[in-house]
Amino acid sequence: MSGAATTEGAVTRFDAALVGTEARDWFALLKPRVISLVVFTGAAGLAMAPGPINPLIAAVSILCICMASGAAGAINMWYDRDIDAVMTRTARRPIPDGRIRDDQALGFGIGLSVASVLLMWLAANALAAFILAFSIFFYAVIYTMWLKRSTPQNIVIGGAAGAFPPMIGWAATTGSLGVLPVVMFAIVFLWTPPHFWSLSLYACKDYGRAGIPMLPVVRGARHTRWQILFYTLILSAVSLVPSFLHQAGWLYTGVASLLDAGFVACAVGVLTDRQDEAGVSLTGDRPARRAFRYSLAYLFLLFCGLLADHFLIMR
């Protein structure tokens, strides 16, 4: 009797572990790291919007942004399953590893996309729902199915997909758009190239093996280093636009200036990294890795500075 109970308990624990593993696989399909940044920038746009904020509408809107980001990520993983399988960085993703079927992933992504847009429409307004739908389409179709495999400017143009959340958040609570959410869009848009090109420098062989025309693969490492610095300088200028438009005060100006100085220093470090004649790093791309990590902190801290300035200084 006790033996049967022990066996039954073991089976129950095994089933629970299996369910937990499957849940983690589906969660991984949503690209949770991307979601975290997308949701944060969307919430920042919502919080910066003028007028009273309905807590329920705000919560549902952020949930919709989260769902939409995950849906686009799932469709991206479905379409990229062939190249994910040959890249070291992505080979263990759920679809190429055989843990989730590709048709399941596509159905999940489409269903989640429709649900997120309809819920945003019902809870917030048509403008927010339209921008949300367009952002899903832009990432899943324009970027994933067209730009990513056809041009080294894939990240530059495709970066618009990840830049929409501040506009969505703002529109969800106001039903309109203003200058500030457009500037926030521009900041994220210009942040995307140096962020991803830093990654592509030290993952260049992976991208080349998969046939993805990332800038270092097509134009070489040296050209990419100059482009990282170029876009970082433009980003630094645009990040100060809220101050010049009197949409932010001295606190944000100080935070942005310090963060910009750090980002430019990282970009200069990438440019002056010890290289061979082809521009390939002789240091294991340590400066590029440092720039990639810094870029993540940069965007988070920049928007934190904008929020802190809004609630502590500008009000």
Curated annotation (Swiss-Prot):
The chain crosses the membrane at residues 34-54, 55-75, 105-125, 127-147, 155-175, 177-197, 226-246, 251-271, 294-314. GO terms for biological process: heme O biosynthetic process. It catalyses: heme b + (2E,6E)-farnesyl diphosphate + H2O = Fe(II)-heme o + diphosphate. It comes from the Bacteria. Keywords: Cell inner membrane, Cell membrane, Heme biosynthesis, Membrane, Transferase, Transmembrane, Transmembrane helix. Pathway: Porphyrin-containing compound metabolism; heme O biosynthesis; heme O from protoheme: step 1/1. It is an enzyme of class 2 (transferase). PROSITE patterns: UBIA. GO terms for molecular function: protoheme IX farnesyltransferase activity. GO terms for cellular component: plasma membrane. Its EC number is 2.5.1.141. It is found in: Cell inner membrane. PANTHER family: 4-HYDROXYBENZOATE SOLANESYLTRANSFERASE, PROTOHEME IX FARNESYLTRANSFERASE, MITOCHONDRIAL. Belongs to the UbiA prenyltransferase family. Protoheme IX farnesyltransferase subfamily. This is Protoheme IX farnesyltransferase. It comes from Gluconacetobacter diazotrophicus (strain ATCC 49037 / DSM 5601 / CCUG 37298 / CIP 103539 / LMG 7603 / PAl5). The gene is ctaB.
